[in-house]
Amino acid sequence: MTSGGTPRVALVTAREALALDEDLPPLRDALAAQGVDVDLPCWDDASVDWASFDIAVLRSTWDYAERIGEFLEWADRCACLTRLANPVETVRWNTDKRYLLELSQAGVPVVPTRFVSPGADASMELMRFLDGGAGSLTFGHADGFTDFVVKPVIGAASRDAARYARVDGTAALAHLARLLETGRQTMLQPYLDRVDAHGETAVIFFDGALSHSVRKGPLLKRGARLVSGLFAPERITPREIGEAERGVAVATLRAIPFGVPLYARVDLIQGDHGAPVVLELELTEPSLFLAQAAGSAERLAAAIIARSRD
């Protein structure tokens, strides 16, 4: 704590993200309004004294996926010096999308997925996935689909993710083979095309309490170029959720094996029959769309202050 007894908070970002993260200004202002000493350090800045903070809150560390080993080593070190939110064990679990299998095993409805490991025969794996028979998916069941998605298990902001038509197997195979050849765990998923009309629903929680929800426009278009920047531009608008979406989002939060996170974002889309299914659970560095909900920055600031004093 500072000499006045107020906490010192780090909102952790990355150099390229500092000017792009639209959540940072309102959150910084909400904390400062409570007398909190706020800094915006970059996670890989070796000059930062992490022990001088009462809590370090991961915000826009959006370059972590290309430096995952370095990032997790930093998180381990940081957690030894101060409170890290979300905690390092949560971050380690959440940065690998195989957590989706655990959610599915806990009874949470999740987009059907096939995981593919480096060393596997890319052509055979893709053929099995598209055949749709027994064993075609690691978990879940998919009715007939026309498009599908190839993406890395460790990735952020749709980077290296692409949508393909079933008839475009050559391009999809090249993408899958490239990811596997570079040693990256990869995932194949049916593209649930209701998202084109309905979009995604992002449900945001602070300290286990529902804060707000938004609609995210569909990101992956057939034949689009891979995302090259830190994140893909998104069309965001407020959205009220129904009981079905709320139920799935809460069930997802309860399935996290490491206790209640400071912040969480559950991304939902409509399945084949319109019921909500989990696309992703974001516990590391999600955009929280604070500008879309009055009072959300103040709610998160209050949760941060409370955690800093635990």
Across the structure, where does each feature detected by a protein language model lie?
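Short, solvent-exposed loop/turn segments at secondary-structure junctions
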Residues: E16, D63, G155-A156, D193-R194, ...
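Conserved N-proximal alpha/beta basic substrate-recognition cap immediately N-terminal to
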Residues: G5-R8, R15-D121
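Active-site nucleotide/adenylate-binding loops and adjacent lid/helix of ATP-dependent enzymes
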Residues: T2, P7-T13, A75-C80, E89-H198, ...
